[in-house]
UniProtKB/Swiss-Prot annotation:
Disulfide linkage: none
Lineage: Bacteria, Pseudomonadati, Pseudomonadota, Gammaproteobacteria, Alteromonadales
Sites where the protein binds substrate: T49, C50, N51, R52, S110, E115, P116, Q117, Q121
Further comment: During catalysis, the active site Cys acts as a nucleophile attacking the alpha-carbonyl group of tRNA-bound glutamate with the formation of a thioester intermediate between enzyme and glutamate, and the concomitant release of tRNA(Glu). The thioester intermediate is finally reduced by direct hydride transfer from NADPH, to form the product GSA.
Protein name as catalogued: Glutamyl-tRNA reductase
A Pfam family reported for this protein in Swiss-Prot or TrEMBL: GlutR_dimer
Reactions that this protein is recorded to catalyse: (S)-4-amino-5-oxopentanoate + tRNA(Glu) + NADP(+) = L-glutamyl-tRNA(Glu) + NADPH + H(+)
Keyword Nucleotide-binding (UniProt): no
InterPro entries: 4pyrrol_synth_GluRdtase, 4pyrrol_synth_GluRdtase_dimer, 4pyrrol_synth_GluRdtase_N, GluRdtase_CS, GluRdtase_dimer_dom_sf, GluRdtase_N_sf, NAD(P)-bd_dom_sf, Shikm_DH/Glu-tRNA_Rdtase
Amino acid sequence: MSIVAVGINHKTAPVAVREKISFNPDKLSIALQEMLNAVQCREVAILSTCNRTELYLVQDGDFDVTQQRLIKWLESFHNVPASTILPSLYWHKDQQAVNHMMRVACGLDSLVLGEPQILGQMKQAYSQAKAAGSMSLIMDRLFQRTFGVAKQVRTETEIGASAVSVAFASVNLAKHIFGGLEKTKVLLVGAGETIELVAKHLYENNVGKITVANRTLARAENMATKIGADVITLAQIPEHMCNADIVISSTGSTLPIIGKGMVEQALASRKHQPIFMVDLAVPRDIEEQVSELEDVFLYTVDDLQGIIAKNIANRRKAAVQAESIVNSQSDNFMAWLRGLNTQDTVISYRKQCLDNRDVLLEKAFIQLKNGKNSEAVLAELANKLTNKFMHAPTSALQSAAQGGELDKLIYLRDIFNIDSQE
């Protein structure tokens, strides 16, 4: 029995290749059942995200045969030639597979080192496999242990503590300055991808109120509905800025949208209560001279890049600690798995012995019922049991001796405790 992880990700293939073997969530249950049958394995799970598709298997067969079956199934299921995906596939087996799964869950293999979203995606993959009935004892235990490792890494290292995107860094900086965002009012200028991410982080941090200003209201309204924000036009910014404790801007404008005079008026209306401002745009949305105002804390994208560079360095240090935790926990899982294999062997051997005993006992009972001498029956039973239990070990010892397999012979003598009996 072995554990296998096979996949394709952002490091091994461009999106044009990755999208060819991504799995539609609506068809995942069918895919899991098909894979079980086509690849002839015990258990399977599938993780499919925009950056990676990975298949996790527990199988009994020859590894090379499993590889061939899996590639053939991927070809058939996705209607894509093997030559398109084979160069991008990576394969891990047993402890390497366990180690890989744990690294993925901890964000150590992610495009953004330490990102937490992958753990949620792995939990979803686990739930889908459970619901499809494609997962049993070993894969279930592996996923549970993997989730535990990810939690341990988050708790014991700083892998996720530092912001490594300008959107996340902006919100973190605001949170640090205000000590919490629950009572703050935020004005977001723009409605592009960066501002959407900022809005998402603000919403997750329970910010007091968000107002979105954009040139076209339709796009801003689409975003605002998701986070319960108000929407205004760019022309309305001057009358609303006085209400904002935080202003974060990122538009595609070629000229500044927020000037020094506009901010001065807002500060006067606020009785010079400070405003925290972040300009994420290039070219800048906020005039450089705004930084001269005493009650304004203005940060540009360059200021944040400096913070992010330090944070990335901190994450890399934390990643070294995380790798150590992963290695230790994958060792623990493999020890559990070996124990499970030993237990299976003991159970199988015990069942075999009990079956042999029951057959011989049944014959002995018949002999006793037929009036045969009880001592003779017991002697015959003991003799047959001894011969039965001695047959396999005797054959193994003779085979090892005749084949000159000294190591095997010593091992067998140790197993049967022969030398200590002499």
